[in-house]
């Protein structure tokens, strides 16, 4: 057997020098173990350290204007719960963390920050695009959905759709194709630019606000928005979402965009 290096005690030598036998050490260890078990039974075990607090900041998760199951069967309850409380919340948490060192940007609304994305330092620009964009996009998405939908575009918005897309059927076809045909993750939008309407598509969580457009309707085509129910049938999901659009809300956003 190899001997330990000179000057290093073996366990037996250390116990001998301390005047402690291996047997007594074993009994002592057993006593500690029994005491520890007794502590656990008596509830005297120190509490686990609390997890670090979640980063706080300017953004909080908005409540929905309807129950999680209100959009069924088009969007199922579980998808809504996960989408809202986990995915949307994650964008908010990461946005607040990103802006913690930049309080001047936290004073801006998400929309104004995205409109001024060129002022954002390069070190946080991608995080702002992804997370502040994700927050703003989802706030709009939740707002323009309603159980059973809300009729059809009417008033100034309805007239503008007929003017800019020839007719409503053409508009519905174009936005449906933009949503279903978006490669990878992203969004399809109805957006206002110079008081005219455009159907556009953006990747990931990029917002039309970054390019000077004002979005008034958005369709989320990230897989987390539909995969539990529709799997790879994105076109079916897009059609279902179209039946939930709250055209009263979209019309109000259009009026604000052309008059604000």
Description of each model-found segment:
Residues 58, 74, 86, 97-107, ...:
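All-alpha RGS (Regulator of G-protein Signaling) helical domain and cognate RGS-like helical scaffolds
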Residues 1-9, 13, 23:
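N-terminal secretory signal peptides
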Residues 16-19:
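Internal alpha-helical transmembrane segments of multi-pass membrane proteins, especially GPCRs
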Residues 177-231, 237-245:
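An amphipathic alpha-helical core segment
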Residues 81, 89, 128-150, 216-234:
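Short, contiguous alpha-helical
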Residues 58-90:
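Mature N-terminal segment immediately following signal peptide/propeptide cleavage
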Residues 30-71:
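C-terminal segment of N-terminal export signals and the immediately downstream linker at the start
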């Amino acid at each position: 057997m190899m001997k330990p290096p000179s000057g290093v005690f073996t366990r037996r030598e250390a116990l001998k020098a301390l005047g402690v036998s291996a047997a007594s050490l074993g009994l002592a260890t057993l006593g500690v173990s029994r005491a520890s078990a007794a502590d656990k039974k008596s509830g005297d075990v120190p509490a686990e350290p609390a997890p670090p607090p979640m980063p706080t900041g300017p953004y909080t998760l908005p409540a929905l204007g309807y129950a999680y199951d209100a959009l069924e069967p088009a969007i199922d309850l579980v998808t809504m719960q996960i989408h809202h409380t986990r995915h949307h919340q994650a964008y908010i948490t990461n946005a607040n963390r990103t802006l913690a060192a930049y309080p001047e940007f936290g004073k801006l609304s998400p929309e104004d920050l995205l409109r001024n994305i060129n002022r954002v330092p390069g070190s946080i620009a991608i995080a702002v695009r992804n997370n502040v964009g994700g927050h703003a996009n989802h706030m709009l998405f939740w707002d323009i959905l309603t159980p059973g939908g809300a009729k059809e575009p009417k008033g100034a918005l309805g007239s503008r759709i007929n003017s800019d897309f020839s007719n409503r059927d053409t508009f519905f076809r174009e936005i449906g194709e933009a949503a279903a045909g978006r490669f990878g993750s992203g969004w399809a939008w109805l957006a206002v630019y110079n008081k005219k309407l455009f159907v556009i598509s953006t990747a990931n969580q990029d917002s039309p606000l970054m390019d000077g457009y004002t979005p008034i309707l958005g369709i989320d085509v990230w897989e987390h928005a539909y995969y539990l129910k529709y799997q790879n049938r994105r076109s079916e999901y897009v059609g279902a979402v179209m039946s939930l659009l709250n055209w009263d809300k979209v019309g109000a956003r259009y009026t604000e965009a052309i008059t604000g």
